[in-house]
Each structure stands twice: as structure tokens, then as C-alpha cells.
Amino acid sequence: MQEMNVKQFAGELKMQPEHLLEQLKSAGVNKTSINDALSHVDKERLLDFLRQGRNEGGRVTLKRKETSEVRANDASGRSRTIQVEVRKKRVLERPAEAARPAAAPAVAQEAPAAEMREPEARPQAPAAEPALKPADRVGAPAVRTERKPEPKPEPAKAEPARAAKPEPKPEPVKAEPAKAVAEPAPAAEATQPAAAPARPVSILSAEEIASREAEERRQAELRARQEALIRERQEREARRMAAKLAAQQKAQEAANPKPAAEKPAESRPARPAEGRSGARPAPAARPAAGGARPAPAAGAPAGAARPAGSGADDRRGAGKKTGGGNTDRDGGKKRGGLKTRGGDASSGWKSGSRKGKRQHQDNQHAFQAPAEPIVHEVMVPETITVADLAHKMAVKAAEVIKALMKMGMMVTINQVLDQETALIVVEELGHIGKAAKTDDPEAYLDVEDGNVVEAKLEHRAPVVTVMGHVDHGKTSLLDRIRKAKVAAGEAGGITQHIGAYHVDTPRGMITFLDTPGHEAFTAMRARGAKATDIVVLVVAADDGVMPQTIEAIHHAKAAGVPIVVAVNKIDKQGANPERIRQELVAQEVVPEDWGGDTQFVEVSAKQGLNIDGLLEAILLQAEVLELTAPVDAPAKGIIVEARLDKGRGSVATLLVQSGTLRKGDVLLAGTAFGRVRAMLDEDGKQIEEAGPSIPVEILGLSDVPGAGEDAMVLADEKKAREIANFRAGKYRDVRLAKQQAAKLENMFAQMAEGEVRSLPLIIKADVQGSYEALAGSLQKLSTDEVRVQILHSGVGGITESDVNLAAASNAVIIGFNTRADATARKVAEANGVDIRYYNVIYDAIDEVKSALSGMLAPEKKEEITGTAEVRQLFVVSKVGTIAGCMVIDGMIKRTSRIRVIRNHVVVHDGELDSLKRFKDDVKEVKQGYDCGIMLKGFNDLLEGDQLEAYEIVEVARSL
């Protein structure tokens, strides 16, 4: 054996070298340094010294600590590494004082032997006879006590030291249950070592045995209490689930009555609960120490060898698992784990290693009962995300995404859906969807309306909208009434804005709204009809009923507004008022003298004929309507038109419909709000207040309001700001949701069609109605091949930011009655941005139309240039067939394509390979001359064939 020094020996013994030197000196081994060599004799002397010094009491205590690692999955499924430390302690004691000298070597030999057998005892499960031979159990009679019947230990109370002891395990209960269950008493085991008195045996002291028995009794009582608590909880859960199921069945039977034969048995749903609750009944009286365990009945089937109420000793260790056995029957070796989510301890993340054994979940909370799907009533707001919609329906978001994918929409979990799409998804998944009434600040407006004290209603002036086809004389008629000259100053002689005026007549005041007649201004006419009391329909006597005339009639009828027809231009030659009446009757506008309820007035705006008669008819109609409105109340009205003025900011034309608007009032109009800083009448004069039916221009709003928005005065500016911000956010969400839906709907179509050429535009106009009309008209020009893409449209002058946007996107800027400032012009020149100015909507539409026409791909046409007849064929080897032809019509060109026609049927269409006249190549051969023609890739020519020459030319297209 190789010698080692003191330091190496101390490292092997895991102790300090200085401490080992002291022990060597005490044993009489003279070593002065840790580097001194140690012989085998020195080690024997040290061992003898230690035996003599420590065995005087007749007892040897062995301690052992093992550390290992276990990998297990936690509740979330992630793998964890758990440190497991096992501590063991063994006390060996000599039985008699006389045997002490002889027993010392035996104890020294048995101690390492016992330690070596301990790790082997855990994986082994001997199925031999219960009584072991004394020669194989050194010190086991004192350590091994009788095994009491125990329930399955709780995970928190597990004792690793006791679980690691070698234990005999009885065979499965089959033929001889009494023998398999019985266990020898300690008295019987104590007599066996006496048969071999020559061999010393170590036993535990009586105090140690008594303390261990007391500890086991305490643990058994504790486990019994825990079993009772668990059993009570399971029974309570079973009763609750049975009651819940019974209530559901009653509700289902009340909703859908079924025949008695189809009803399920009452006891069927409770069967799983009974199996759980009866799994651990109260154990019977425990057998006395050393007594045999009670055996099951001999006639019990194999499956009943471990009944649900068999107590805890069935779960303590059997040599083998019975068929389909539970994890409770795995020999008691399973280490308790953390009980989570009502599952078995073995499935927790602190559970012991599985070693390939089947895992069975504790079915404590796995109650499954037949139930019909629950239908939810889902309240859907204007916009909602996919995640929120899934939460409202109590389904996974993946189900909603799957349903949307079936509808052709690719969405994410945070995608915003509009209300219409969300309602379709809710119905698709079998729930009931309803549009939600949003809990928004606008409810404050309804409450405020309810708190208003009834004000005195007074007579108000009628609001009259003048409508009709373009160039039928609407503005000229208003000029004659107002004694003004508005029409003369309008660009192109047509009205492109909605105007509001009020006129004082001897019989009262009348407010007029002048609407454009051009087809592009449909939205303006609709707003005019919405805000009006009476519609004056102007029809030119020499022109008749036109498309915009019919549209105006539809607007008036949709708004439920009476119509007064003014037949204009009766002084012109060719005027035919009777024809006008007949055409209007076809549109369900019947004159009074024909038995209808519509007044017809023949006027001439140019000559001023019968203007008073028109005013009389308007006031007469107003008297019939009995128009009233409160005066001493907060003002309410409608935004007729709005624009952005460079010096004054946002300017809105407001028609007051009820109440009185005063300077300084807080006004809310759509997403704009603010205090009224100034009020101007139609002549530009400042006024302090405006009553019902008075049109005014107001300054001071935070933003340009939308034309057609309702406006109202609020008492609290803070509340007005809150409502405006809420509306702006809601409008933005709805717009983004609709844009996203449109993108998704058109995605596959765009992929199939390929890239569509687009003309990007930026539109800036003087008023909001103008850019709405212009943008709508230009977008109507789009086709499948080219389209108008409006990047931005707004009110006001052309700014530097507009030019930068146009430069980044290669867009054209259209200024309608606006101009670019100096900075914008410089930036436009530097970046080469094209800015076009227009003041007539016709010109803008025509130029954009021509630009789109230039973007269209040209159309290809065939043009026949000549015809030749084959007179003779020449076959040349390695060259092919050459046709001797006579040009009988037109001209044959070298670049032409050739069609071979035989008996009036085209047999070949291809290219010309060579064209010769005599031996020379020529570019063309005219009518009346012969030539030689060879076709590329075609030699099956016959005499008499017709050769038709044609060219493909490109023709420019237009919209």
C-alpha cells in the first residue's frame, strides 16, 4: 500500500491536519509536521487509540449525510433542480458488559457494513419471508419495530430517514392473505439472536425504542386527523357538485322538456364523487403492537384486494403494484411533494423522481358532468380588441382569431375591431351580440337637456334653402332678393360654397341658405336640407328638370321639408313652364292648380319679375308650419360651413336654431370647442348676440369643426373639453378600425391584381365643404388600373409641411381657392414639387382626369398593312421553303407579322424570316410587285395561300 503523509490522510478523513497531528501524538505516534509520512502501523495505532477512547460507554453512534439533486416540473411546467439532503443516525450498543472487549472489533467491522447496506436497502423490495435471519440483521432487532397500519403520509410530514430503512415488504394479497399481512412480534425476533451466542449483536436502548414508539404514535394520530379532514372536505365538495348538477338539470328540463326515458339517472352524476369520498373512510381500531393485520375476506375479487376503505396499510408498501394500481400503492417509497391545484402530491414540482412509473392524478377536482354550452350576451362597443372580445365571450383569443381567419381577416390579439365585425364574430361563435351604449361623457348633454327649464316659445323666421341644378339661376335669384351682386364675383359663374343670409321683408325676416348646384356638392345640399324649414327649388324654364334637380327633390323629401318651386328665366325665348310642371309631376311634385300641395311661382331673376310673389309664397308656407323656438335659453345650432383663416384661425358659419348665442359663450361642435371670441354677420359686421334662425360666423374654436355638426352652448368649459377629447378619440379608433378592415378585405384582391398605378394628391381648400366635394369627385375617377390616392386634405393655405409631405410621397398639391406661402413656395422649388391652383372645380377634375389617362397602359390594336398571294414554291435544301408571291393589296413590310390563310381559315401566325425582290433583301414591297417570302418556323405552304401582313400599334386610352 502506498504511504501517505499526514496532510493527505487528513484530507481523506475530511479533517484539519493540525487536529490529526494532536490525535497522533495522543496515540503515541511521534509526528511533528503535516508532511511526515504515515505507515500502516501508525494508522493501526491511531485506530486502536480511538477505539479504546470512544467505546468505554459501550455505544457507537454513526451519522451520515447524503446530498442529491432531483429534477422535477413545477406547476407552470418548467423544469427545476431541487437539492435533497438525507441525514441518518445509527446507534449501536453492546448487550453485555462481559462481551465488551470481544465486541469492539466486531462493532468496527459492522459499522461500515451497515452503512454499505443502507443505500442498497432503498431500491430493493425483497419479497422473501417476513422474518429475516439474525446473521443478516446486525442491530436490526432493536431498530426494527412492528409496522403499524398507517395512512398515506402527508407531504409536509414525510420523514426521509425512516423511509430509507430496509423494510421487509409482504407479497400481494392473493392466496394467503393472513400470512402476507402478518408480521412477527419483537419478542419472537428477540429470541432468535440467542441461538447464536458466539456472535455479538448490537441493539438500541430501551429509552430510544420508547421514544421512537411514542413518536410513531404521535405521527399516526396526526395523520389520522389529516385523513379525517381530507375526507370531510371531499364529501363536502361532492355534495356541492351534486347539488349544482341537480340545479342545472332542473333548469335544463324546464327549458327543454324531454321524455322520461331520456332523463339521466339521478345517482349517475354522483358516482365519481362517491368514489372519491369513500376512498378514505375512518379506519377501524388499530391492532395492538405485534398483532397481525386483519385480512380481507377470502372470497373477495382481485380488484377488491384493496378496497376504498381498506385503511392506510394498503398504501404502505407492497412488493408489486396490482394491475392498474394507483401511485399510493408504490411501496410507500414515493416522496411527498407540494400539493398544488388540488392534484396529487406526486404531480407537484417538489415531488420525487417518477422513475418511469405511471402518474395518476387525484380526481378530487376532476368532476365532469354533461352540460350544454353556455350562451353569453355580449355587449359590443364601437371598437374592441380581439383579446377583450374573447374575454367577454369567455373563450380563448385563439378561437376568435380562428373565426376571423375563416372570414378572411388576419388579425392579432391586440387588433382593434369595429362594432360591425365584432358582432358578426360573436354570432359566429354562438353567442348573442348587442351594440353597447357607451358610458361616455356625452350622457352629460342629455342630463343637461333634462334640467333645462321650459323656456317661452316665440315665433321665429323660416330657414329657406335654395336648391337646383347648376346654372339655373339660384344665386342670381338670391342677389335680386338681397339686392346684392354675389353671383358676379363667383369664380366660373357657379356657386362652390354654401352661403347663409337673412333678409328683412315688410312681412318678416327670412333666412336663406344658398347651396351649390354642381354634382360634386351633394354633401353640401344634404346639409342644407337638414338645417332648413322650406326648400325653394329653382328650375330654369328653358332647360327643364336636370339630374341635380331630381337629387334636390330627394334631399327635401328625405328631410321631410315642404317645397316651393321657382320657375326661373321665364323672360327667355323658349321658356316653357308647362313642360316644367309635367316633368316635376313625374317626380311626384304636383302643383296646387293641378290638385297638389306644391306652390309654383314663375320668376325672372334677371328682370326682377314676380320676386315679391316668391317671398309671399315662402312666408305663407312658413305660417302654415307655425315655426317657434325658445329665445331665452342656451343656443343650439348647426355648423353650415367651416374654414381655417390664416389671421383669425378657425372660422365657422353657425345657423342658430334655438336659444340665443352670445359673445363669450362656451360652444361645443363635434370635436371642436372654445369660447366665442367674436361673432360676425353675413356682411362682416361684429354683433354681440344672435337669436333663432340667424346665421353668424364665429371665431375662437380650438379646431375646424366638421360641416353639418351640431353645436350647443355648455356652461362648463372643462366638461366641453372632456366631451370633445372623448369624441376625437372615439372617432380616431373607429376610423383606424375601418381602415384596418378595408386593408384586410382588399389584401388578397391586391395580391391577385398586382400593383395598381396611383396618383397621390394633397388637397387644400378654402372651406371644408369644398375639399370634401373635390376629394369625392376625384376619387370617383379611380379605375381598376389607376386610382387617385388622396394623402391629405384640409382647410387653409398650403404650408411647408404640406410640401414636405408631397416631396416624400411624390404627390401633386392642389390648391382650391388657396395659395402657398413664401416658405412653402421655396421648399417646393427646391424639391421639385408640383403645385396646381384652381378656383373652378371643373378645371381641377378635368386636369386630374387627363393625368390619370396618361397613366393608363396603351391599348394594342392590329392594323392590316397588305395581302400577298402565293404563286409558286421553291424548296431550297438547308434553307427551307420560299414562296414566290404577288402583292395584291397594300404593302408587305420586313417588320410585319404574317398570317397564312388557306380556304379562309388561319393555319399559321408568325414572323417574317426574309423578304426579297429578285436576289436583294428589301424593306417593303408594294402592291403589284412580286417578291420572295420565307416564314420563320413554317414550311407547309401551298400554292394559292393568302399571306396577310399586319402590325400591332399602341393607341392611347382615356378615362
Curated annotation (Swiss-Prot):
Residues 55-72, 144-177, 260-274 have a biased composition (Basic and acidic residues). Residues 55-201, 233-370 are annotated as: Disordered. Its main location: cytoplasm. Residues 604-606 are annotated as: G5. It is found in: Cytoplasm. Residues 493-497 are annotated as: G2. GTP binds at residues 468-475, 514-518, 568-571. InterPro entries: DNA-bd_dom_put_sf (IPR009061), EF-G-like_DII (IPR053905), IF2_assoc_dom_bac (IPR013575), IF2_II (IPR044145), IF2_N (IPR006847), P-loop_NTPase (IPR027417), Small_GTP-bd (IPR005225), T_Tr_GTP-bd_dom (IPR000795). SMART domains: RAS (SM00173). Pfam families: EF-G_D2, GTP_EFTU, IF-2, IF2_assoc, IF2_N. GO terms for molecular function: GTP binding; GTPase activity; translation initiation factor activity. GO terms for cellular component: cytosol. Residues 98-114, 122-131, 178-201, 243-259, 275-311 have a biased composition (Low complexity). Residues 514-517 are annotated as: G3. It comes from the Bacteria. Residues 568-571 are annotated as: G4. Keywords: Cytoplasm, GTP-binding, Initiation factor, Nucleotide-binding, Protein biosynthesis. One of the essential components for the initiation of protein synthesis. Protects formylmethionyl-tRNA from spontaneous hydrolysis and promotes its binding to the 30S ribosomal subunits. Also involved in the hydrolysis of GTP during the formation of the 70S ribosomal complex. PANTHER family: TR-TYPE G DOMAIN-CONTAINING PROTEIN, TRANSLATION INITIATION FACTOR IF-2-RELATED. Belongs to the TRAFAC class translation factor GTPase superfamily. Classic translation factor GTPase family. IF-2 subfamily. This is Translation initiation factor IF-2. It comes from Laribacter hongkongensis (strain HLHK9). The lineage of its organism: Bacteria, Pseudomonadati, Pseudomonadota, Betaproteobacteria, Neisseriales.
